[in-house]
Design a protein with these regions (language model features):
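Conserved active-site histidine-acidic residue motif and adjacent donor-binding/catalytic loop
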Residues: 223-231, 392-403
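Conserved catalytic-core segment of nucleotide-activated headgroup transferases in glycan assembly
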Residues: 176-197, 307-400
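Alpha-helical solenoid repeat scaffolds of the TPR/TPR-like class and their adjacent stem/linker regions
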Residues: 1-331
């Protein structure tokens, strides 16, 4: 619904929401009056979109219906594209207000838990120092939810060995030869096999190259997150895992739920998605030394590795040969920007606008966009051109070879 309105001349659904406005002065969107009937609240929340110009009193909405308010906050953080001033400021406001409230929610039964990973991951793209605090609150709710469902942690005093080595169980989110996590973390895990017996656990999309990284690979079985966690715990118990490792966390619900359990005496993440977990069950984060801006960014203890200790490999889809064409003294300097939609924000576009305005030569920005397709693309393109006008071209999502 959000993308349909955002890509249209309407931009938002405020004209529809005015139907529910009890204030005779409908021009003042900062003084929107809504009756307290739950049906009206639900309809309002469905059509209150990231681009809305209506000011919402979150405290008042929380007092009326905490779980409905929490659901709205989940929804406003979930889009992959939150870059305009309106949408970005809404998420920023929620990230400051919501964590304390979210921590009081008893479980996930009456909130949209299926988009929890969006709440978890997308906070990284805000700019506030405390932007990840929402994870700590979400982790508390997830932990309570699991315990209420009968979850028990693994007895991690029972350790085993395979081929004379301690066992490291690795939970994968996305891991195949054309995915970025394979490119960034496969070589270091292959090297880890010198000292550990590596058991990979992931979905059936892990290809032959991905499975070959490990001494042993298991497809994670289960019809829901909890059953998958049970299967994961069973693998850890049978192997006597000493280390539980997640090279990435935030793209999949299973990994986020697993980060709130005890499956091994030592539990570690890496920066496959470059952000802290705020989990009580993750002891360490593996990071190359030159990636550490400030240790204050992490709730975990840092295992700081030398620069280039985690060498990358090319994507399986990368071309074998690239012809580089240097244009001397061009009339227009073309600047390519590769980005998924979630990484765009008003600060970045303002910086590009300043570059264009201050440059001594004419520049043109070419945005090669990931996840910008269908009804989303006109919305993204309008945002980019609102800063750069005809000095930018926004290309929709394309297959890797075309990109």
């Amino acid at each position: 619904i959000n993308m349909i309105f955002a890509s249209s001349p309407f931009v938002n659904a405020d004209h529809v929401l005015q139907t529910y406005n009890r204030n005779p002065d409908k021009t003042n969107l900062s003084d929107f009056h809504l009756d307290s009937a739950r049906s009206s609240l639900i309809k309002f929340c469905i059509l209150y979109l990231p681009e809305s110009n209506i000011n919402v009193n979150l405290d008042a909405l929380w007092n009326l219906d905490p779980e409905l308010c929490a659901s709205l906050c989940f929804a406003l953080q979930s889009p992959r594209f939150i870059a305009t001033d309106q949408a970005f400021s809404k998420r920023s406001t929620i990230l400051q207000w919501f964590p304390e409230k979210l921590a009081t929610i008893e479980n996930l039964n009456n909130v949209p838990s299926s988009i929890s990973h969006d709440v978890y991951m997308h906070c990284s793209y805000d700019v506030a120092e405390n932007k990840h605090w929402v994870k700590k609150a979400l982790n508390q709710v997830i932990r309570r939810h699991l315990l209420q469902g009968g979850w028990t942690d693994r007895d991690v005093t029972k350790l085993g060995e395979r081929d004379g080595k301690p066992v490291m169980v690795v939970l994968l989110e996305h891991f195949h030869s054309s995915h970025s996590i394979y490119r960034t973390h496969s070589t270091s895990m292959i090297a880890a096999r010198e000292r550990f017996y590596l058991i990979g656990v992931g979905n059936d999309a892990v290809d032959e190259a991905g499975r070959a990284v490990f001494d042993e690979f298991h497809v994670l079985e289960g019809n829901n997150v909890v059953s998958k966690l049970d299967n994961l715990k069973d693998i850890c118990e049978k192997s006597g895992a000493a280390i539980f490792y997640m090279p990435s966390i935030g793209m999949d619900l299973t990994a986020i739920f697993a980060s709130n359990t005890r499956l091994a005496p030592v539990q570690v993440i890496a920066l496959g998605h470059p952000a802290t977990t705020h989990s009580d069950f993750i002891e360490y984060v593996i990071v190359e030394d030159d990636y550490v801006g400030s240790e204050k960014c992490f709730s975990e203890q840092l295992l700081r590795l030398p620069k280039d200790a985690l060498p990358y490999v090319p994507s399986a889809l990368a071309p074998q040969h690239v012809e580089y064409r240097l244009r001397e003294n061009p009339e227009v300097v073309n600047i390519g920007i590769a980005s998924t939609t979630m990484k765009l924000n008003p600060y970045f576009l303002a910086a590009l606008k300043a570059i264009r305005d201050r440059a001594n030569v004419k520049v043109h920005f070419h945005f090669a966009l990931g996840q910008s397709s269908g009804v989303t693309h006109p919305y993204v393109e309008r945002f980019i051109k609102s800063y750069l006008g005809n000095d930018a071209t926004a290309y929709p999502h394309a297959p890797y070879d075309q990109y």
